[in-house]
């Protein structure tokens, strides 16, 4: 600003300088000895032109300076807004982290209170508590607890020992006996019989494991038969039983993980002894080659085999014995399962999740990618809205059979069904993660209504026309045919008399002769003027011997 003021002052002094120059020029002109080729007017115009150009340039510089100041101020305001947004996001992230931390602490404290406050059966009169029940828990698992007589680290007197803590199984007391007897087969059958109550089972099995002498060995025993020795058959029931058994194996390993998470380091070292880990590693090494034949696309993110393998590594803490790259290849095979995020954390793969999510996106599993992005707080790197829109585009994309515009009706139905399923899946994902503000669901609901209406209309158009039912008749008397037709009537009902009688030819009407007809009086003889002889009256009985209401006789004409 000081330079600007100095330049302005110099420009203001230009007029005075010109006046001084004029005086000097007048003095020079007064001296006749000096001849000048220039006139004063020309010099004056020249200097005024210089003055105007300097002022114009000065104003241009001022405008540029103001523009620069405006841009600088806007940049500072934008920087402050971004800084405030970052601070707000950091604060929100810290609040979410604090909430999760508080929830985890509350869950841990609740579990500890539940275990500590659970009632323990008191000894009867005359009995004494076992010695290891009153010892301090830090002395129970001393170094001499694993000896030659107890190489597997079997927990002794676990029912009342503070090693495993207090426990109480309320809903299913049978679990205590099965776990106490180390009966893995019976445990499988019990879970299969009570599969409708899996939620309550999963709460009580970890407590029931405390009754087992070695819960880790019990779970490993339950894994026998996960891959049956006989070749799979086409028997659907057997396949369903195998799937149920595999789900039970996974649930038992998860329950064991819940039990182990509540133990201290010394107790954990006893339950997961070296022999137990070696046995688990042997099972995992036997399963690993069988996973190579699995197809990621065919598994559709819901592979029980891959889930069981990863859960085995996480539960028995043998992840370090296997390559990380091989484990990462199995994550997309279990991405649809609800335990996928927790399983990845247990395996120590949280830092590798961006690469896993990228693989899911490239393989068309955007919904699973969104779920994992929220689970690991990677929504800034992977936008959920963009992934959901990409999923809908994939759902509407044409298949190899053709394009939706010129496809056959069957292929068009397939396109519509795929889009309908995709829309419902996206809406469910939006509602689960509260993305309604970022991705409104009203247009999606409208599109679903259009597709369902078109589907219903097409279904009605392709259905065969059903014959219209006949109008119900009123109650009519039933008659039967002659004796020859009785045996041929398969319905067992008589013939229904139609609403209209047939037009009979009275001259040729048949009649029955016999005692019934003989009892009727003979008709009077007709006059001689008639040219025809009417048939004799036969009363109100017809040829089938059933009474009927005969119409009046026709008039005679003379």
Swiss-Prot record:
GO terms for cellular component: plastid. GO terms for biological process: cell differentiation; flower development. Residues 9-102 form a coiled coil. The gene is FRL3. The keyword Coiled coil applies. This is FRIGIDA-like protein 3. Residues 454-494 are annotated as: Disordered. InterPro entries: Frigida. The keyword Transport does not apply. The lineage of its organism: Eukaryota, Viridiplantae, Streptophyta, Embryophyta, Tracheophyta. Residues 454-463 have a biased composition (Basic and acidic residues). Keywords: Coiled coil, Developmental protein, Differentiation, Flowering. Pfam families: Frigida (PF07899). Belongs to the Frigida family. It comes from Arabidopsis thaliana.
